[in-house]
Amino acid sequence: MVGWSGNPLFDLFKLPEEHNELRATIRALAEKEIAPHAADVDQRARFPEEALAALNASGFNAIHVPEEYGGQGADSVAACIVIEEVARVDASASLIPAVNKLGTMGLILRGSEELKKQVLPSLAAEGAMASYALSEREAGSDAASMRTRAKADGDDWILNGFKCWITNGGKSTWYTVMAVTDPDKGANGISAFIVHKDDEGFSIGPKEKKLGIKGSPTTELYFDKCRIPGDRIIGEPGTGFKTALATLDHTRPTIGAQAVGIAQGALDAAIVYTKDRKQFGESISTFQSIQFMLADMAMKVEAARLIVYAAAARAERGEPDLGFISAASKCFASDIAMEVTTDAVQLFGGAGYTSDFPVERFMRDAKITQIYEGTNQIQRVVMSRALLR
């Protein structure tokens, strides 16, 4: 037994070296290829093409795709690290790897081998993107009340209806779509399908005008007698809602990772600014009130990072009952991101309220992490049900 003076081989809560190397690599790429364009992407509400090109070239656009389909087969913690480091400089760009995972996780978990071979290699090798279509205007938190329908027609499926709040809508090649196949069975009458952007009867609505993540288009999807091949169903008919929930169990930590990255970016900017800013003849970082704010911000970010990585690790191990920890990681990290970015703006004073500095963008971008993939109120419902069942 090693003495209490310290054991350098004790690796509990310590990431493997390959994860640290991954962080260094993606951070360097993000700072060089993505950060210089982040302000312009936000101000012009344009898609971060530079980020997409850099992520595609490095293989970080869909690092989660298994090796047997041409991907890197990175684990869930590695995927979170990539998303976190990109979000640290540009939250919109971080939605490229994040939503590629969201849009394909149901397929990876429940899809047929043939369908996986049809879809996944295009993300890994061709730079295709994927999106996830669950919500509708009148079926948000109550997703099971969706009205989009899918009906068998010979060897095909015909989809009718629409979806809303689709991240990267119009940029993705593939869409995982939930639709009702048996209205009499409620949630057990929902099925999951893969729709291609060129499928007959499928179209994209206009981009939403948003508070934040302006570089990532958010659109509606329209299905007007949209015909897709019969083999593009994920799993068996009636299992789609379960697939949707299983997907979110695996991907909510990625939104937590995005939130951690946003918060870290704001904290980093605040540290630099407070050290440089002088009032009363000295750096404001020498004032105890400022020091305490920075300390609290850093403490919260570190705690959020740990719960996100813990949730991702449990998902990677395939542990059962992921609902609580997955919801907790997303909920806690996103609440922290909103707190930390707000404090960062405060530390900048009036300058922080302008677009001359990135913290106002971080603050606007942070808000959505409390909303998408289930509002934080719904996350608390998920957690409380897990506690009380």
UniProtKB/Swiss-Prot annotation:
Gene3D superfamilies reported for this sequence: Acyl-CoA dehydrogenase/oxidase, N-terminal domain, Butyryl-CoA Dehydrogenase, subunit A, domain 2, Butyryl-CoA Dehydrogenase, subunit A, domain 3
Keyword Oxidoreductase listed: yes
GO molecular function: acyl-CoA dehydrogenase activity; flavin adenine dinucleotide binding
Highest taxon listed in the record's lineage: Bacteria
Pfam families xref list: Acyl-CoA_dh_1, Acyl-CoA_dh_M, Acyl-CoA_dh_N
Catalytic activity: a 2,3-saturated acyl-CoA + A = a 2,3-dehydroacyl-CoA + AH2
PROSITE patterns registered for this protein in UniProt: ACYL_COA_DH_1, ACYL_COA_DH_2
Entry's EC annotation: 1.3.99.-
Protein's UniProt keywords contain Membrane: no
Record keywords: FAD, Flavoprotein, Oxidoreductase
InterPro entries documented for this protein: Acyl-CoA_DH_CS (IPR006089), Acyl-CoA_Oxase/DH_mid-dom (IPR006091), Acyl-CoA_Oxase/DH_mid-dom_sf (IPR046373), AcylCo_DH-like_C (IPR036250), AcylCo_DH/oxidase_C (IPR009075), AcylCoA_DH/ox_N (IPR013786), AcylCoA_DH/ox_N_sf (IPR037069), AcylCoA_DH/oxidase_NM_dom_sf (IPR009100)
Protein family according to the UniProt entry: Belongs to the acyl-CoA dehydrogenase family.
UniProt-recorded name of the protein: Probable acyl-CoA dehydrogenase fadE25
Species of origin: Mycobacterium leprae (strain TN)
Lineage: Bacteria, Bacillati, Actinomycetota, Actinomycetes, Mycobacteriales
